[in-house]
Amino acid sequence: MKATLVLGSLIVGAVSAYKATTTRYYDGQEGACGCGSSSGAFPWQLGIGNGVYTAAGSQALFDTAGASWCGAGCGKCYQLTSTGQAPCSSCGTGGAAGQSIIVMVTNLCPNNGNAQWCPVVGGTNQYGYSYHFDIMAQNEIFGDNVVVDFEPIACPGQAASDWGTCLCVGQQETDPTPVLGNDTGSTPPGSSPPATSSSPPSGGGQQTLYGQCGGAGWTGPTTCQAPGTCKVQNQWYSQCLP
C-alpha cells in the first residue's frame, strides 16, 4: 500500500488540531460504503473533481462502533493539509507542506491486515497516529505517505451528488463518527512539529470563507466574513459557507 496525497488546488481553511497518516490504493472494488457495483467502483471514485478525492478511512473515521459496512462515517468529507513529513524516515518521502485536498470516505481500511497503518478505535498505528486515510488514486497525488492535519468539512456539491449514487445513502450506522479526541499524533523522529499560529484570521475577528467558526472546543472566531454564514456541520465543526 503506497501513500499518496493530492497536489490539488490549495483550499483555504482553519488549522486542524488532528493529524493522520496517509497512503494510496486502487483495487477497483465497490468498497464498504456501497459506492459501485459487483463489476467495480464508480469512475468518480478516482477523482470527484479538482482536489477532491475518495478514501478508505481507518475504523475511527469509518464507524466508531465497529461496523464494517455502511459505517456512520460513509459520505463524510475532510480537508487534509500536508505537513510535508512522512511518519518515519523509512516509510515514505513526505511532500510539500501546506498543500491541501478534500477526501470523502467511501471505504474502510480495517485494522485486520493493515495494522501498520490503520488503527483500531482508541488505538494507534505503528507510527503512533490514531487516524489514517488510504486515498484512492493510481498515481501519487501530493506526496509519498505524507502526515496530514485534517478537519471535517461540508462536502462540495459534486461530492454530495456523487455520494447520492451509493448504496449506503440513508443506511449508515448512527453512532457519532468520528469522535475526534485531543490526540495530535506523533512527530517523526528527528523532526519538529509544524509551527502553527493561535492568532485569529484577519478581518476584525471574523473567519474567512470555508474556515472553521465553531464546534466543541473551538476558541477562534465565530462570525464569518461576507458573504459567509456560520453553519453547523456536526457537534465538532461549524464552517463559514456562502
UniProtKB/Swiss-Prot annotation:
Location of the region described as Catalytic in the Swiss-Prot/TrEMBL record: 18-182
Region ranges (Disordered): 177-206
Catalysis performed (reactions): Endohydrolysis of (1->4)-beta-D-glucosidic linkages in cellulose, lichenin and cereal beta-D-glucans
A Pfam entry, by short name: CBM_1
UniProtKB keywords: Carbohydrate metabolism, Cellulose degradation, Disulfide bond, Glycoprotein, Glycosidase, Hydrolase, Polysaccharide degradation, Signal
GO molecular function: cellulase activity; cellulose binding
Signal peptide bounds: 1-17
Transmembrane segments: none
Entry annotated with the keyword Lipid biosynthesis: no
PROSITE patterns listed in its UniProt record: CBM1_1 (PS00562), CBM1_2 (PS51164), EXPANSIN_EG45 (PS50842), GLYCOSYL_HYDROL_F45 (PS01140)
Gene3D superfamilies, sorted: RlpA-like domain
Annotated GO biological process: cellulose catabolic process
Keyword Metal-binding included in the entry's annotation: no
Disulphide bonds in the chain: C213-C230, C224-C240
EC number, UniProt record: 3.2.1.4
Feature: compositional bias, Low complexity: 184-201
Active site: D27, D134
InterPro entries: CBD_sf, Cellulose-bd_dom_fun, Expansin/allergen_DPBB_dom, Glyco_hydro_45, RlpA-like_sf
Glycosylation site residues: N182
Residue stretches making up the CBM1 domain: 205-241
Gene Ontology CC, one term: extracellular region
UniProt similarity note: Belongs to the glycosyl hydrolase 45 (cellulase K) family.
Name of the protein in its database record: Endoglucanase-5
Organism name: Hypocrea jecorina (Trichoderma reesei)
